[in-house]
From Swiss-Prot:
Pfam families: DUP. The lineage of its organism: Eukaryota, Fungi, Dikarya, Ascomycota, Saccharomycotina. It is found in: Cell membrane. It is a multi-pass membrane protein. Its main location: membrane. Keywords: Cell membrane, ER-Golgi transport, Membrane, Transmembrane, Transmembrane helix, Transport. This is Pheromone-regulated membrane protein 9. Residues 1-111, 159-298 are cytoplasmic. May be involved in endoplasmic reticulum exit trafficking of proteins. Residues 133-137 are extracellular. It comes from the Eukaryota. One of its GO terms (biological process) is vesicle-mediated transport. It comes from Saccharomyces cerevisiae (strain ATCC 204508 / S288c) (Baker's yeast). Residues 235-262 are annotated as: Disordered.
Length: 298
């Protein structure tokens, strides 16, 4: 190799090694493979190929950086999609090792339960160290008088189901939208979202109200249990008849406008009826798959 070609080769090698756009030695060696024969050791060809390689690499890195920044921005601004929620659902049953550890966690996060525990521990300590004083006896009676109603409040708080109307509407909307099967994975997603809703709106102290998806399903069944629902067709027909009768007896438009009433939010009875129809449909499909030939019982 002549000294002139050697000079150009060394110069190009230093430029390539100093170029930060090339990330790995594999890319650098790929660029060197172009110069294995003497036919390519022309100074003009070397510089031209070098500039093309750098521009191509910068373009690829620029596209990759822009796509990564766009993805990061979209992940930061947008809410998680339904697919990501379904793939990353973690219920308390999956997080805690046992139901006892879950129950202890819930109790220690409940304010009334913590106050009750403090009162009980204080009463026990006073009884142990100051059991022979009259003041201690009087104070013990006072503490226990607070402990009894406090215990009742904690038991009611953990045993009584959520009665918030907006929460029930949210649950019915999720059921109508997702149409969950009896043992379907959709119930896991619904349970996860309802736990988050209770925590975000201050209805529960932790995002772990429902321990598993069966608990959320059981809560929904308690809403429709013992209720009698009319079919949507019948209700729609009755609505038409009622509308016709109202038109006949309404009188002037101003009188009709005055007789109308404002309803905030969706109709709860209609939501409950639609969700009950979906549940009944999937109940039939579930039992038909489990025990074929039992259509006569539905």
């Amino acid at each position: 190799m002549s000294p002139q070609y050697h000079f150009y080769f060394v110069s190009f090698r230093n430029l390539v090694l100093n170029e930060k756009c090339l990330r790995s030695k594999k890319q650098v060696m790929k660029s060197f493979n172009w110069y294995k024969t003497d036919r390519y050791f022309d100074p003009h060809n070397i510089l031209q190929h070098h500039s093309r390689a750098i521009e191509k690499t910068r373009y690829k890195l620029g596209m990759q950086t822009s796509s990564e920044s766009t993805d990061a921005k979209s992940d930061f601004l947008d809410e998680p999609s339904a697919y990501l929620i379904e793939k990353n659902v973690a219920l308390p049953k999956d997080i805690f090792g046992s139901y006892l550890s879950y129950w202890i966690y819930e109790v220690t996060r409940h304010k009334a339960a913590v106050i009750l525990l403090v009162l009980i521990v204080t009463s026990i300590l006073l009884l142990v160290f100051f059991y022979n004083t009259e003041f201690c006896v009087a104070f013990e009676i006072l503490l226990f008088s607070f402990c009894f109603p406090g215990t009742c409040m904690v038991v009611i708080a953990f045993s009584e189901p959520i009665g918030d109307r907006e929460f029930k509407v949210k649950l019915l909307m999720e059921i109508i939208t997702r149409k969950p099967a009896v043992k379907g994975k959709e119930w896991r997603t619904i349970t996860y979202k309802m736990n988050q809703y209770l925590f975000d709106h201050g209805l529960w102290d932790t995002p772990y109200y429902f321990y598993r998806d069966e608990d959320c399903h059981r809560y929904f069944l308690s809403l429709i249990k013992g209720r009698t629902f009319k079919k949507q067709k019948e209700s729609s027909a009755s609505n038409v008849k009622d509308a016709q009768s109202n038109d006949e007896t309404a009188g002037t438009p101003n009188e009709a406008a005055e007789s109308s009433s404002f309803s905030a939010g969706p109709n709860f009875i209609k939501l409950l009826t639609k969700a009950a129809e979906i549940e009944q449909q999937f109940q039939k499909e579930y039992w038909r798959q489990e025990y074929p030939g039992v259509d006569e019982f539905f």
